């Protein structure tokens, strides 16, 4: 069994997984064909009382990969001009190598064996992340390839709304609609929402469990 002190660590709270909050902005909905244009990654930290908070955020504007599709409707929606030199965009591979380095460093510091993506409507972000990793031939990704924490689902359960802006406002988190659809802004609001839900569950007595079974013999997936 895990005592309360040990339960207040990422490695026990999420079964050895280190939660990493991610948001992407893209030029469409198809991860196979449409460009990844922006990504932000928020790293979290947990204090000795088991309360999690936003630690820091990495942010990259991304150059569309060669041959990428750019849907005009998607660009109009997120307001991104991929040709604007002021974006300071970098190659996908450059961004992901830096993300891998920083995530692995934080994961190791938390004594976790793998990282797990947290995102709002996580299947979308995870799909684009996985495709970018595959497209660039990157190995040893810190991220679980298919498991994730979806804050849309969590917010629907805990707060009663699945839309990020409305869930944040209902939870008392400031949300500026004019800043929305920026990966940097949305990631940090998603991180705040995830932390609030996890911390509230703990405050209500949902964690730690009275008795936690040792699952060391179960699959790591």
From Swiss-Prot:
**GO cellular component entries:** cytosol
Q: Which residues bind Mg(2+) 2?
A: 23, 25, 181, 186
Cofactor binding remark: Binds two Mg(2+) per subunit. The active form of the enzyme binds two Mg(2+) ions in its active site. The first Mg(2+) forms only one salt bridge with the protein.
Molecular function in Gene Ontology: 3'-5' exonuclease activity; magnesium ion binding; nucleic acid binding; RNA exonuclease activity, producing 5'-phosphomonoesters
Cofactor(s) needed for function:
Mg(2+)
One annotated GO biological process: tRNA processing
Which annotated residues bind Mg(2+) 1? 23
Tell me which CDD domains the record gives: RNaseT
Task: Write down the top EC class of this protein.
Answer: hydrolase
What EC numbers are recorded for this enzyme? 3.1.13.-
Keywords, A to Z, come to: Exonuclease, Hydrolase, Magnesium, Metal-binding, Nuclease, tRNA processing
Site Important for substrate binding and specificity — annotated at: 29, 77, 124, 146
Q: Which residues form the active site?
A: 181
Where would I find the Exonuclease domain in this sequence? 20-194
Record keywords: Transcription regulation included?
no
List, alphabetically, the Pfam families matched: RNase_T
The keyword GTP-binding appears for this protein: no
Protein task: Trims short 3' overhangs of a variety of RNA species, leaving a one or two nucleotide 3' overhang. Responsible for the end-turnover of tRNA: specifically removes the terminal AMP residue from uncharged tRNA (tRNA-C-C-A). Also appears to be involved in tRNA biosynthesis.
User: Subunit structure, per the record?
Assistant: Homodimer.
Under HAMAP family, the record lists: RNase_T
The family annotation for this protein states: Belongs to the RNase T family.
Protein name in the entry:
Ribonuclease T
């Amino acid at each position: 069994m895990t005592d309360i002190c040990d339960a207040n660590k990422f490695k026990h709270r999420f079964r050895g997984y280190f939660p990493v909050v991610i948001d992407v902005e893209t030029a469409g909905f198809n991860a196979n064909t449409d460009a990844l244009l922006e990504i932000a990654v928020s790293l979290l930290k947990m204090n000795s009382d088991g309360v999690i908070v936003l630690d820091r955020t990495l942010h990259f504007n991304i150059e569309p990969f060669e041959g990428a599709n750019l849907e005009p409707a998607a660009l109009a929606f997120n307001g991104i001009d991929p040709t604007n030199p002021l974006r300071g965009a970098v190659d996908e591979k450059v961004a992901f190598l830096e993300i891998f380095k920083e995530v692995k460093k934080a994961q190791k510091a938390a004594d976790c064996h793998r990282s797990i993506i947290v995102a709002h409507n996580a299947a979308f972000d995870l799909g684009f992340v996985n495709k970018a990793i595959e497209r660039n031939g990157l190995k040893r990704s810190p991220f679980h390839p298919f498991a994730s924490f979806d804050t849309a689902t969590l917010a629907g359960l805990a707060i009663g709304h699945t839309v990020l802006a409305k869930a944040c406002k209902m939870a008392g988190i400031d949300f500026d609609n004019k800043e929305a659809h920026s990966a940097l802004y949305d990631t940090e609001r998603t991180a705040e929402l995830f932390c609030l839900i996890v911390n509230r569950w703990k405050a209500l007595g949902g964690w730690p469990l009275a008795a936690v079974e040792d699952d060391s013999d179960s699959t790591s997936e």
